[in-house]
Amino acid sequence: MKVIGRIKNQCVFDHWGQIQSEVVLTAERIRHICEDHNDDYEEYGRYIPETVEIPNLILLDKKDQNTALFIRHVEDTNINVVVKIAYAFENTGRKSSVITMYRLGEKTKARLMKNLKMIYNDQD
C-alpha cells in the first residue's frame, strides 16, 4: 500500500466532513487497472496524484455515496481516478483509496457531468 497523495479540495470536506485525506493505491488495485484498462496505468498512472490533489472536476458516484470521481485533463485526454472516501472518525486505520483509474473521452466526460452530481468544477 502506497500513499499517492492527499485530498485537498475543500468541496470534498464540505460534502463529507471529516475524512481521511491521505489516499492510498494498493498493488491489487494497480493490477486491476493494468488488467482491465489496457495501457492506461502505464501511460497515465503518473497523473494519479495530480488528479486527486488538483482535479478539474469531482463527481459523486450514484452507486456508492462514499465514492467520488476525480477527473483531470492531462496531455490529450481526461483521467478519471475513482476514490473510496474513508472517514476520519471511524478510527479503523483505513485511508481513502483508489478503486480504479482510466481515461475518459470528451463524450463520456460530458455524459458523466450530465448524469452525476458535481461537487466541484474548476471552470465555475
Regions from the language model: what does each represent?
Residues 1-124:
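Ribonuclease/tRNase effector modules and their secretory precursors
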